Amino acid sequence: MICASEQSVTVLDSIYDEVKKEFAYRGCYFLKKGEELDKVRKTIIINGALNNKIPGKSAYEIAKLAGVEVPENTKILIGEVESVDISEEFAHEKLSPVLGMYRAKTFDEALEKAERLVADGGYGHTASLYVHPAETEKIAKHAEAMKTCRILINTPSSHGGIGDLYNFKLAPSLTLGCGSWGGNSVSENVGVKHLINIKTVAERRENMLWFRTPDKVYFKKGCMPVALDELGNVLHKKKAFIV
């Protein structure tokens, strides 16, 4: 699992059962609350950090490591949890086929939970939203709320985040910048352009200076009487600048 992989999913109450049914149909296993859930909790996160034995392992192998029996063809282990606090192991970045699943009464509540998960899981990376394309207000609201550099709409996070496969706005790359939010120097997918040394030759150029001159400039010795007469009687000027 790459860093852009889904780590948690938040589902609205109105479609929660339907989504859960679809997950099960697709080969996901919902951990039973109690012993099964706790066993996997203690396996995926140890002393507040990811257990280095689970990345690269299948859902079946992780369950076996935790002492939980699941079908061998299980694709994802899902833990239905409530807390988005860092004390909840399923709220962490897991880098494995293990998901935390949350439910929310409203879209705003779902956003709040997602914001917290991003805050503790790591600012700057990737957030996904599955919504009807016509609901542009929700898309805009989600994009504004998520402090991530990749905002994916109706796109698988793993494959969408690396660009090219499901969208053409992200450059194809397996090195994904997280911007200053994530302590990176770039906020986009790192590509060839970031590895090129570009020379810039800058010749001296100075900013243009200008000043506004009057319609007439009187000079030469003896011009003063004529100048003042013309300015006052012909041009009807009341002020003159004398250098």
Could you say what each language-model-derived stretch is?
Residues S14, A134-E137, G222:
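Alpha-helix/helix-capping structural signal
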Residues V11, G79-E80, M101-K105, V217-M224:
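Short acidic-hydrophobic, aromatic-tinged amphipathic segments that line or gate anion-handling sites
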Residues V68-M208:
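Conserved C-terminal structural/oligomerization subdomain of aldehyde/semialdehyde dehydrogenase
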Residues N207-V243:
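An N-terminal, well-structured beta->alpha segment
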Residues E18-E22, E61-L65, E109, K113, ...:
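Alpha-helical scaffold segments in soluble metabolic enzymes
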Residues M1-D85:
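ALDH superfamily catalytic-core signature
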Residues E6, G124, K237-K239:
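A general structural motif
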